[in-house]
From Swiss-Prot:
An essential GTPase which binds GTP, GDP and possibly (p)ppGpp with moderate affinity, with high nucleotide exchange rates and a fairly low GTP hydrolysis rate. Plays a role in control of the cell cycle, stress response, ribosome biogenesis and in those bacteria that undergo differentiation, in morphogenesis control. This is GTPase Obg. The lineage of its organism: Bacteria, Pseudomonadati, Pseudomonadota, Alphaproteobacteria, Hyphomicrobiales. GTP binds at residues 166-173, 191-195, 212-215, 279-282, 308-310. It comes from Bartonella bacilliformis (strain ATCC 35685 / KC583 / Herrer 020/F12,63). One of its GO terms (biological process) is ribosome biogenesis. It is found in: Cytoplasm.
Length: 339
């Protein structure tokens, strides 16, 4: 399935039905009086979070959604039928914005959560509603109110426990494919991954979700390579696994490029717990790998791990480190809720 993390939709709720002008007509009742019913309310437009979706691709092909109008009122004080609702099914992590794509309307983070995007118009009053002591047989009724019409942006921010970040060809997709059942495209050229992939990793009976964020480059926070949208997927991650290819001539510079993008993007991305690891260590002699590891450790001020997703050397150690940070973050969240 193709991945789409942003889509514009146009929604319109149903208009209310018109009230009825009607009079009671029965045998032997000469002046039955008014009995016109009210119009039915127009249908609403809802956003609903469903399980099993991880893309907004459906909204590339259908962008206009219109709920049904309410039914007109009828005689015998019968209210018109309510218009049918329209439901936009979206994945967990969908945010909905106004047409300016900046004003947040709602953030949908749980399966089953729903939000009314456009409320149906109320039905008009029938003539029975207008009976007064001085007007026993009114001949007027109200039309229904019009529905709401809005243009909205849907934006998906994947919800993963850990985000795998790094420059293009840092080995992110190979790592994800090695530790999960995800099948991202893997090739020896930059930007193989053009959209995020999710996979479930397991280690020591612990399970967590990892997201392979497409290769970030210098200027990503400004939208270079649509990197600003990719950075948005990192916002919800509990830990960042920052991969640097051991084949980089200057591993320190490669690390700093991504760090600058995180800091410039904002939204506390640079404050997230980060695990730094050198990938593809099976491609260089061990002495050269250790020299690059020491240089990077001096620069980042924390231990730097090394692994190969092909030979699986050091892979479990990296996974255990990621799992430990995620476990601690989950425990902190539970404690906060209890407080």
């Amino acid at each position: 399935m193709k991945f789409l993390d942003q889509a514009k939709v146009y929604v319109r709720s149903g208009s209310g039905g018109a009230g009825a002008v009607s009079f009671r007509r029965e045998k032997f009742i000469e002046f039955g009086g008014p009995d016109g019913g009210n119009g039915g309310r127009g249908g609403d437009v809802w956003a609903l979070v469903v399980d099993g979706l991880n893309t907004l691709i459906d909204y590339r092909y259908q962008q206009h959604f219109r709920a049904k109008n309410g039914g007109h009122g009828k005689g015998r004080n019968m209210t018109g039928a309510k218009g049918d609702d329209v439901v936009l099914r979206v994945p967990v992590g969908t945010q909905i914005f106004e047409e300016d794509n900046k004003t947040l309307i709602c953030d949908l983070t749980e399966v089953g959560q729903r939000y009314c995007l456009a409320k149906g118009g109320n039905g008009g009053f029938g003539n029975l509603h207008f009976v007064t002591s001085t007007n026993r047989a009114p001949r007027r009724a109200n039309p229904g109110l019009s529905g709401e019409e809005r243009a909205l942006w849907l934006r998906l921010k994947l919800i993963a426990d850990g985000g795998i970040i790094g420059l293009p060809n840092a080995g992110k997709s190979t790592f994800l494919a090695s530790v999960t059942t995800a099948k991202p495209k893997i090739a020896a050229y930059p930007f193989t991954t053009l959209y995020p992939h999710l996979g479930v990793a397991r280690i020591d009976a612990r399970e967590f979700v990892l997201a392979d964020i497409p290769g970030l480059i210098e200027g990503a926070h400004e939208g270079v390579g649509i990197g600003d949208r990719f950075l948005g997927h990192v916002e919800r991650c509990r830990v960042l696994l920052h991969l640097i290819s051991i084949q980089e001539e200057d591993v320190v510079k490669a690390y700093q490029i991504i760090r600058r993008e995180l800091e410039t993007y904002g939204n506390n991305l640079s404050d997230k717990t980060e695990i730094v690891a050198l990938s593809q260590v099976d491609t260089l002699p061990i002495e050269e790998c250790k020299a690059k590891q020491e240089a990077l450790q001096k620069s980042v001020g924390q231990p730097v791990m090394m692994f190969s997703a092909v030979s699986h050397e050091g892979l479990d150690n990296v996974l255990r480190s990621v799992a430990h940070v995620i476990e601690m973050a989950r425990a902190d969240m539970i404690n906060k809720h209890q407080d």
